[in-house]
Swiss-Prot record:
Single annotated GO MF: structural constituent of ribosome
Summary of subunit composition and partner proteins: Part of the 50S ribosomal subunit. Forms a bridge to the 30S subunit in the 70S ribosome.
Record's GO cellular component terms: large ribosomal subunit
Gene behind the chain: rplB
Protein name (database record): Large ribosomal subunit protein uL2
Protein function: One of the primary rRNA binding proteins. Required for association of the 30S and 50S subunits to form the 70S ribosome, for tRNA binding and peptide bond formation. It has been suggested to have peptidyltransferase activity; this is somewhat controversial. Makes several contacts with the 16S rRNA in the 70S ribosome.
GO biological process, any: cytoplasmic translation
Organism the protein comes from: Dictyoglomus thermophilum (strain ATCC 35947 / DSM 3960 / H-6-12)
Amino acid sequence: MGLKKFKPITPGLRHLILPDFSEITKEEPEKSLLKPLKKSGGRNNFGHVTSRFRGGGHKRLYRIIDFRRDKDNIPAKVASIEYDPNRTARIALLHYADGEKRYIIAPEGLKVGDIIMSGENVDIKIGNNLPLKNIPDGTLIHNLELYPGRGGQLVRAAGTAAQILGKEGKWAYVRLPSGEIRLFDLNCRATIGQVSNVDHQNVSLGKAGRSRWLGRRPHVRGSAMNPVDHPHGGGEGKAPIGHPSPLTPWGKPTLGYKTRKKRKPSDRFIIQRANDKKEK
């Protein structure tokens, strides 16, 4: 995977940096693994906006991804590496030996023709999925389960990877991409390797219209609003926000204000918070 830069022959091309899609081997998705995807426009079932600045964008079909990887001890051949409009990572189409087809998140380095497997005692090889208890310390992993059998929920974005630091009793110490160190049950499963599309962080959309194609509407500053719409709004000209610290649109402190619930049950699994040098 590489990046493409463009000659600045128009304003929209001047800062445009896009992936070159050189790893994509198939343009049309597998029809049996598609389903319709309805747009919400950032609204909930009452029609109220719950996620601001969303709407529009190109129509999409949802690709059904296998996050559980529960088809144990059956070899699967990588048939293609494909683009998925619903996520930043690439996806891989697997053809299992029994004839079933499934999509998975493609790890970096996975190629068409590779054979991968899931199971308790499969090899430590990119794309294989197995419990944390059978993965050596120091290994990079992704598609990590929070609870055994629930399917991978963490470390699924482009270029991300977690690392197993050690094991003690029935727990594994895992460093997440945020820097947080957390305990996971040794029976939780994960996939070996780093998520594909590692250059995603260097992509530059180049123009506002490209953001609109992705379904993102303009992100309006609070200071550009009226007082009725935002605590930072109003004033003559470019006025200061008029508060000791920045506030959310709903009047709560922001920028550094801790929003995690106190005494949350999962606190006991967190050994070190992200960017926190002092261990608990």
